[in-house]
Amino acid sequence: MVSTDLPPLIELRGIRKRYGGGDKPEVEVLHGIDLDIRAGEFIAIVGSSGSGKSTLMHLLGCLDRPSSGSYRFAGEDVSTFGSDELAWLRRKAFGFVFQGYHLIPTESARENVEIPAIYAGLPPGERMQRAADLLGRLGLSDKLNNRPNQLSGGQQQRVSIARALMNGGHIILADEPTGALDSRSGAEVMELLRELAGAGHTVILITHDRDVAAQAQRVVEIRDGRIVADSVTDRQPSEQPLLHHAGLSSLEMTQAHEDTGTPFWQGLHETIRAAWRVMWIHRVRTSLTLLGIVIGVASVIVMLAIGEGTKQRVIDQMGSMGTTIMYMSSDVPSTGGPVGVITEEDLDEVARLPEISRVMPVIGDPILVRHQNVDKQIYVFSSPYIMPMVHHWRVAQGRFFTETEDRELAPVVVLGHKIYRSFFPHLSNPVGQYLLIGTSPFEVIGVMAERGAESGSQNYDDMVFIPYRAGRARVYQAQEQPDYIVMEAASMDQVQEAEEAIRALLLERHGREDFRIGNAAARLKTQLETRDTMTRMLGLVAAVSLLVGGIGVMNVMLMTVRERTREIGIRMATGAREYDILSQFLIEAMLVTITGGTVGVILGLTVGALLVFWEVPVVFSFGVMIGAFACAVITGLIFGYMPARTAARLDPVVALSSE
């Protein structure tokens, strides 16, 4: 028997527990309970259904708080403890054995037993060995990796007892431990509890069965929320050596106020493992949740890559045309009057300006071009011999026409790359062939290198190029006025000065501004601003899809919290702090988004590679990929916080009683 001279380990004075209040009727289920329990006692609290025994057990195990009264544990007033201090007490002092076993269905027997040690910060190797040893002593050495649904009721209750002993189990709280078992399994469980009492554990047995209660050393009867009897039996605890070395250690209550729990990094691996297992078990739902994040991340990457690729193509095209290029054409004066006329004399004067290096008049129009039985409407570009130099464009085959050929109206033509492929698909070198342009035959003397379209203009590869004077005389019916003039500034720094000098010169010669001047740099700026706007719009659409994915994560996590409410209660009963539950569900949400973000990046790169294959301009940015991935993770953090916070704030008693 336990000496009554010892100070009580647990001391209850005037404990009352009320439920309801506010707009609901208040109900008191415990009415001034006074109870002392000493270390090493094997005590049974017996009562019928509704007597208040389960409520008393919840208060004893620090799963709930009394409405009034005093609860002292090892001399400390528990009513002053915060939630983390109560979690420490459950983790270090108590071990729970429930009627419904309360094992986490996704974990193996050993993993269920390890749970209290995870929150106690025990190293993985030591934790696994201790769990295996406890299960071995309880006759379950061959069931370490079995899930709860692969165990009998008696075996599940043994796992529950092993879990209660994992952190030492100074006090074993057994709530109807034989209620769901057959008589044989029930007898085995009671024998184990007697052995625990004999090994020095304090065992508190909650039961409605007086025969079961009679196996304890002390029986306390509770009825209608009051203790009506407290008697001592003649039963002695079992002296079997099975659990003599269960790992009891002294409790230092001062640690309750100092212990900060398991460091985040130490339990991270276990949390990720558990989260990954839950994701795998619910893989269809997880996949559908991931889909929103995957599409969002991939959309951001692909859309911004297309925007950047298009922007880069504009820069390359405009750059290849020359950022020192300016364009001039006739215009209607702002004051009214006829369209201005730019003469050759005007061009000669412009060419003499020191800020100008080249002047190139251009006439161009779609003309019917024929070769044998193939004819096409093609843009015929008529310009002086300096065109390749002005536009920084090389000849791929043959040559470009010369100044002499231009001056002598030579009927020669240079083909754009696509025109060459269109008219001569099977000919490796078309030089020497003839095309009929309008009604005039022209000899092919060269093919330009592939170039593409200048943004906002016709594709240069779809053109043919003829001398300026030959074009005026042979194709454009002696047209005197050029359609527009291309001018090249002496340097990029002089573009603005050159434009002002041309404007001043022509104003002096014409007396009015009947012309229009633009430069490639201004066009480039306009084009880039347009592309940037489009890119921002594309990015916004992609960001919205990522936001929708985040909302999907939140919905699924809220559903997960509801489905796993009992698991949350089990973890709290085994010593998890609010922070532990919060971090667990936050990590689960982030793991979903990290996985989705990773798959999204891979999908985005894959789609981008296909777009490149289809010749769509795409430029991937490592920064965009990192940003999209980071946004996915932050989305998981933000949208996972509310479900995680909901889980962390659950009442342990309510959580344990959920179905």
From Swiss-Prot:
Lipid metabolism is among the record's keywords: no
Xref: PANTHER family: MACROLIDE EXPORT ATP-BINDING_PERMEASE PROTEIN MACB (PTHR30572:SF14), MEMBRANE COMPONENT OF TRANSPORTER-RELATED (PTHR30572)
Any one GO CC term of the record: plasma membrane
ABC transporter domain boundaries: 10-249
EC number: 7.6.2.-
Cell membrane keyword on record: yes
SUPFAM superfamilies, A to Z: P-loop containing nucleoside triphosphate hydrolases
Location in or out of the cell: Cell inner membrane
Positions of transmembrane segments: 287-307, 538-558, 594-614, 619-639
Enzyme class at the top of the EC tree: translocase
One of the Pfam families matching this protein, by short name: MacB_PCD
Organism encoding this protein: Nitrosomonas europaea (strain ATCC 19718 / CIP 103999 / KCTC 2705 / NBRC 14298)
InterPro entries cross-referenced by the UniProt entry: AAA+_ATPase, ABC3_permease_C, ABC_transporter-like_ATP-bd, ABC_transporter-like_CS, MacB-like_ATP-bd, MacB_PCD, Macrolide_Exporter_MacB, P-loop_NTPase
Top-rank taxon, per record: Bacteria
UniProt keyword terms in alphabetical order: Antibiotic resistance, ATP-binding, Cell inner membrane, Cell membrane, Membrane, Nucleotide-binding, Translocase, Transmembrane, Transmembrane helix, Transport
Any one Gene Ontology molecular-function term assigned to this protein's record: transmembrane transporter activity
Task performed by this protein: Non-canonical ABC transporter that contains transmembrane domains (TMD), which form a pore in the inner membrane, and an ATP-binding domain (NBD), which is responsible for energy generation. Confers resistance against macrolides.
UniProt GO BP: response to antibiotic
Membrane disposition: Multi-pass membrane protein
Full protein name: Macrolide export ATP-binding/permease protein MacB
Binding site for ATP: 47-54
Similarity field: Belongs to the ABC transporter superfamily. Macrolide exporter (TC 3.A.1.122) family.
Subunit description: Homodimer.
